[in-house]
UniProtKB/Swiss-Prot annotation:
Cell wall formation. Keywords: ATP-binding, Cell cycle, Cell division, Cell shape, Cell wall biogenesis/degradation, Cytoplasm, Ligase, Nucleotide-binding, Peptidoglycan synthesis. It is an enzyme of class 6 (ligase). One of its GO terms (biological process) is cell division. ATP binds at residues 111-117. Gene3D superfamilies: Mur ligase, C-terminal domain, Mur-like, catalytic domain, NAD(P)-binding Rossmann-like Domain. Its EC number is 6.3.2.8. It catalyses: UDP-N-acetyl-alpha-D-muramate + L-alanine + ATP = UDP-N-acetyl-alpha-D-muramoyl-L-alanine + ADP + phosphate + H(+). Belongs to the MurCDEF family. HAMAP family: MurC (MF_00046). This is UDP-N-acetylmuramate--L-alanine ligase.
Length: 436
């Protein structure tokens, strides 16, 4: 690491990129970067830190920069191309992160779903007990001087996580996703196998996931879950409108009762994983208990507020399993209210590949509203539409647009759960303005 260079992020508003930029800034390095001019929720933290954000332009590239390129951008991007032509050091995000974690007790959180929530929970618990640096996929990052732990989100997309060799890994689940890259579930499984082989001290894996049960690695694997065969077992689970409580057993030893102000079974599982890895690092159980009780969640994961007589929940869910978990959490907290699912399908390839799963998960809501499919930078069009998904829903689904939300605004004293990984917040803003 070089204090003389300026670390320049191409795509600085990306969720992982903004987190990494904040870590380097906290550690006293010079940081700036470029991105689209449209506002994204990650830039709030960058602006608060005084980090310069520029529009994309090859004129930004100059001598003295070390370029960190976001994974969404190809080598043909004008800034990356110019940096290479000038002979500047250029790293991909995952390559640089792999270098950064050396010298800490590193804990990577991997899984098709639940990465960000679990990384956020683990970061919260450890950082209030011991010096901890962390990188969360919601745009939050912190670089702590003399940190003992480095907690980070390990993304399976395009096998980026194989750049990492952490001490520990939490693996929340393995599911088929990213159909623009992975061929099938077996392809995803092979990526997790490859990552698992690089973990040094221990893997903490969800025991109900058959793919994780079949991991074949030399590193010890400790399973967590709610069954007797799990090494770390959550028992006596109680779910109320205030949160969840449970006891954790490690084999025959009770680690005591824990309470979380969180909803949905997935949060009990995520918490059990956090307790397990912390226990192995000999973190005091009473301190873990205290910090779990104080966790308020991460950005865009079941973020809620009131608008008139409506409860609005904003969530990043964009896969059938995530939608199911989010709606389950909404039912736990609001058992007596109607649940309205407002979903923006993310990419044509994912919508087509997981169509039946989306229909099954969305049907857990009382009413479903769909926006048009959000296209990514890599994929502008496809042969499927939101109307195809609406037709698969047992009770149908209504298509809403930014110009016409009348079908949604007709509801009152209910819970509107907005879900998606694209620009669903644009719809939320319009809805909110109309409901005020």
């Amino acid at each position: 690491m070089d204090k003389a260079t300026v670390y320049y992020f191409v795509g600085i508003k990306g969720s992982g990129m903004s987190s990494l930029a904040l870590i380097l800034h906290d550690k006293g390095y010079q940081v700036e970067g470029s991105d689209i001019e449209q506002y994204t929720f990650t830039q709030k933290g960058l602006a608060a830190a005084g980090i310069k954000m520029l529009p994309f332009s090859e004129d930004n590239i100059r001598e003295g920069l070390t370029v960190i390129a976001g994974n969404s951008f190809t080598d043909d991007h004008p800034e990356i191309k110019k940096a290479r032509e000038m002979g500047l050091p250029v790293y991909r995000y995952h390559e640089f992160l792999g270098k950064l974690m050396e010298g800490f007790t590193s804990i990577g959180v991997a899984g098709t779903h639940g990465k960000t929530s679990t990384t956020g929970l683990l970061s919260h618990v450890l950082s209030h007990i011991a010096p901890t640096s962390y990188l969360i996929g919601d745009g939050t990052g912190k670089g702590t001087p003399d940190a003992r732990f480095f907690v980070f989100e390990a993304d399976e997309y395009r096998r980026h996580f194989v750049a990492y060799h952490p001490d520990y890994a939490i693996m929340t689940n393995v599911d088929f996703d990213h159909p623009d890259y992975y061929k099938d579930l077996a392809d995803v499984q092979s990526a997790f196998q490859q990552f698992g082989n690089q973990v040094k001290k221990g893997i903490f894996a969800w025991g109900d996931d058959e793919s994780l049960r079949h991991l074949d690695v030399d590193t010890p694997i400790y399973y967590y879950g709610t069954n007797d065969r799990d090494d770390f077992q959550a028992v006596n689970i109680k779910r109320t409108t205030k949160g969840s409580s449970f006891e954790v057993k490690y084999h025959d030893e009770s680690l005591g009762k824990f309470e979380i102000p969180l909803f949905g079974e997935h949060n009990v599982l995520n918490s059990t994983a956090v307790i397990a890895v912390s226990y192995f690092e000999k973190v005091n159980l009473d301190e873990i208990r205290r910090e779990l009780l104080d966790f308020s969640g991460v950005k865009r994961r079941f973020s809620e507020h009131q608008v008139g007589d409506m409860v609005m929940i904003d969530d990043y869910a964009h896969h059938p399993s995530e939608i199911k978990a989010t709606l389950d959490a909404a039912r736990q907290k609001y058992p007596d209210k109607e649940i309205l699912a407002v979903f923006q399908p993310h990419t044509f390839s994912r919508t087509k590949a997981l169509m039946d799963g989306f229909a099954a998960s969305l049907s857990k809501a009382d009413h479903v509203f769909l926006t048009n499919i959000f296209s990514s930078a890599r994929e502008k069009s496809g042969d499927v539409s939101s109307k195809d998904l609406a037709a698969k829903l047992p009770n149908g689904g209504e298509i809403i647009t930014t110009d016409d939300m009348s079908a949604l605004t007709a509801y009152h004293n209910a819970v509107a759960v907005f879900m998606g990984a694209g620009d669903i917040q644009k719809y939320e803003k319009i809805y909110e303005d109309q409901m005020k």
